[in-house]
Amino acid sequence: MQKIDFNKDWMCRCLTRDEAAYPVTLPHDAMLSEPRTQESTGEGNIGWYIGGDYEYTRNFFVPETYKDKKVLIEFEGIYHNGEVYINGKKAAYRPYGYTNFYVDTEGFFQYGKENEIKVIARNADQPNSRWYPGTGIYRPAYLHVAGEKYIPVNGVKIRTLSYDPAKIEVVVKTSAPGELSLKIEFEGSKVLRVIGESTKIGNVNNDKIISSDNKNMQPNESVQTGKNGQKSELAQVEAEKNNQAAEYQAIFQLDVPNAKLWDTEHPNLYTCKAVFGEDEVTETFGIRELIWNPQVGMTINGERVILRGACFHHDNGVLGACTYPEAEERKMRILKENGYNAVRSAHYPCSKALLDACDRMGMLMMDEYVDVWYIHKTKYDYAGQLADWWKQDLKDMVDKDYNHPSVIMYSTGNEVAETAQKKGIALTGDMTNYLHSLDSTRPVTCGINIFFNFLSSIGLGVYSDDKAEKSAGNAEKNAAQAAGKNEKKVVKSGEKTVNKATENGKKGLGSTKPEKKKKPVGSEFYNTLACLVGDYFMKCGATLYPCDLRTKDAYANMDIAGYNYGIFRYKHDLKKYPNRLILGSETFCKDAYSFWEIAQ
């Protein structure tokens, strides 16, 4: 599909303050323009900004020629509870603020006329995050346009089958049956070209090569994989999970001559150009084989790799939450220059621009899904929506990550104390298995705070099986109430909405009346406790026997056990659980060298 920039000529208007609309270019973080006040309900987590709901509008001409075309609008990130309207009709809704999504415009456009697209981003429902989230359409937007015969978005999937000899598999989805061609290039020079045929998914001919200039691939050679003539696991999974209009695909298995492998020191990148009819899609990929096991840890192309990683959040400092390729690359460059070779997207899926930077620079990525499951850490966070959306969210994260050699694992969450309870242990397994069905080439982890899991299991904080059920119900109730309030506040998509912090924001610092000291709850309880007891006590606490009891079942439901602040458990657990692969998913900076010594 043709990808068209859709970032210019937008107008932004605040719905929670009486302000005039102003022109913006995406990406745009509306929170940066807000006043700050000590009465901010999001407090320091959002930099004492007041929060607000915003309306983005853009008028654009839709030509008559689009009548017979497939047109999607992609938003890489809207924070949060994004609503998309086209010519006054609601076309899409996406509650999670960190996953990209596509809006199908069929039935909404008026052809040969000016059209209006309107996006509402709600962030007056504070607090809803433990870190600065930004507000609005803070990542880029694009139009994707295609004719009758096209390759859908995320329709080209590339994986390495082996590195010695170098062999790759390319699966191409199409909207119709027909001939398609692939051209593999390295640094602008052609490596090989093949022509194949896309047929209905499940058809025995959908992996037929018509012609090839690859000496190791003969014309009409069948490239089926697996035993007994079965399709590869990837093809079977793709057929099952395919939810796009495309029902056709071609599968290519190609030997790459004189391959230049991808690793942290030599991040060699290839391009794959797939042509189907008049549609052309170009994907960048690297040839690298990832293996993980308890005996050697993790290897890339047969070489053991010790991760020297950092957790980082998605914002770009004074630039706010906006995603700019230059800023994303700058972060990775600084880390790389200081000896890091891996990063963790704490605690949300990272941007496409960041993945591109990691690919180019040889930085390994652990892409993380979410900071909260079904129990609140803040009052209006994602707990209320996760049950309905986690599968779609994970699918979109995998689609984004799949062709990037830098992505070496997925994380299903951060310090989700639900993993100490039966319901959470089951969800751990469900998420792991679902990710395996989407991508069998990468391991799955989850960052668990070992000591806090134990505390939650004895009722300190908000977590227990009974409380989990109640909190999950309350989460849905709170989300419904918040949505109801927002509907009442924005009656005609334009009437002013008001909250306490907004009113006080107009008056500078607001009321000077002393407030009652709040009792720490939820995540705040654990953060307060950590500050009081200190890092050494936390690490010692993690060695308690009950901590093992409250984490072992969840760890058994993932490929790699994520230890947050569990450095004192490593040697003991490696002996007790010889088949467990441990990742230091989070720790104190001063322990970095000790981690390195243990890992070696």
What is the predicted role of each segment?
Residues 110-112, 173-208, 235-293:
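Extended acidic/polar, glycine-enriched regions
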Residues 3-17, 30, 46, 51-154, ...:
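Accessory beta-strand-rich segments of carbohydrate-active enzymes
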Residues 139-157, 288-303:
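Low-complexity, Pro/Ser/Thr- and charge-rich linker/hinge segments at domain boundaries
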Residues 98-111, 127, 131, 257, ...:
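Active-site mouth of glycoside hydrolases
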Residues 85-91, 187-188, 277-278, 301:
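Short strand-turn-strand beta-turns centered on an Asx-Gly dipeptide
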Residues 197-246, 467-511:
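Intrinsically disordered, low-complexity terminal tails and inter-domain linkers enriched
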Residues 82-85, 184, 274, 298:
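Short aromatic-centered micro-motifs
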Residues 149-176:
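Surface beta-strand/loop "capping" patches
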